[in-house]
Amino acid sequence: EYGQFGGEPYGALVGDYHFDHSPPDVELLGEMSKVAAASHAPFITGANPTLFQMDSWSELANPRDLTKIFQTPEYASWRSLRESEDSRYLGLAMPRFLGRYPYGDKTDPVEEFAFEEDTEGADSGKYCWVNAAYGMARNITRSFKEYGWCTRIRGVESGGTVDNLPTHNFPTDDGGVDMKCPTEIAISDRREAELAKNGMMPLIHRKNSDMAAFIGAQSLQKPAEYDDPDATANANLAARLPYLFATCRFAHYLKCIVRDKVGSFKERQDMQDWLQNWINNYVDFNADTSPEEVKARQPLAAAEVQVEEVEGNPGYYSSKFFLRPHYQLEGLSVSLRLVSKLPSQKAG
């Protein structure tokens, strides 16, 4: 569709798979990243707990440091994949979330016959789990439907929630009632930051509720570090999916626009002015005061277009687009200073 005249490009690719660091999976992810990069459509899929040397996500709280797991020799090909240029088009979501209530008279009755689905015991495999990639896909499509852009896909207040999850209550051994975590395991803030640092997109359950959220939307790519702080900052932005989705959408439009202009009598300056005026429609020039809804529809804080002639090839031009998106809050360091007045000893 992307390379077809009149075609409608795909915005994203979603795969119902779970990948780990095995050689076949790394090779397949590498090839999929090339397809996603060529079509400017990020590939969203799931991560397998075996990627972290675990049998299930319920063991996620056990390792003290997740980063050390990826420093062993068996992860050499995985590290190479994360350092590749096209890996920014890969997104691995985890853990799984509950797809439905267990069948039963009090949870989800079956009209045709009496059936009680057995979910007793500690075996979480008795439940119906869904790939977390579908949760991210839901946020992507919702953002596109409401704003025309796939930028509001993360955070509790900015489109990252997955609502109305099944909340199955079960009796405990001590006679109480507990709720099955709808995301396999509750993930702490510290562990969420570790997972994001290692290229994962964790789905975090809000305790005692039927809601979970993607706090971050980090791609699989490991951002490169440079001596120049600005270059390092650009690498960090390029590895985050909200900014990548905005850039990909511009790439889709540009190919169609330039294709329609082939054969028209345009000088270099005319083409540059026309493209600059077009892209200014998506720049929020009042970013300091505009609400979040305006930023979602106009995802750029600044944009500049440069068109240059190709030497030795009349009628051909090369263009450069400099895009600066609205920055999203990634974290906040808090310092506290406590002041206490102590009673002084009175002179006798």
Question: What kind of region is each of these model predictions?
Answer:
Residues 2-182:
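Extended, regular secondary-structure scaffolds
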Residues 36-40, 218, 222, 231-235, ...:
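C-terminal accessory domains/tails appended to large, multi-domain proteins
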Residues 42-45, 49, 263-267, 280-288, ...:
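Intrinsically disordered or highly flexible coil/loop and linker segments, enriched in small
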Residues 44-46, 214-217, 308, 322-324:
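Generic beta-strand/beta-sheet core signal
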Residues 115-270, 274, 334:
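Long, contiguous, structured domain-core segments that constitute the functional module of a protein
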Residues 270-290, 294-296:
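Short, hydrophobic/π-rich interface segment
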Residues 288-314:
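Short, structured protein-protein interaction patches enriched in aromatics and acidic/basic residues
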Residues 304-348:
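C-terminal edge-of-domain segments
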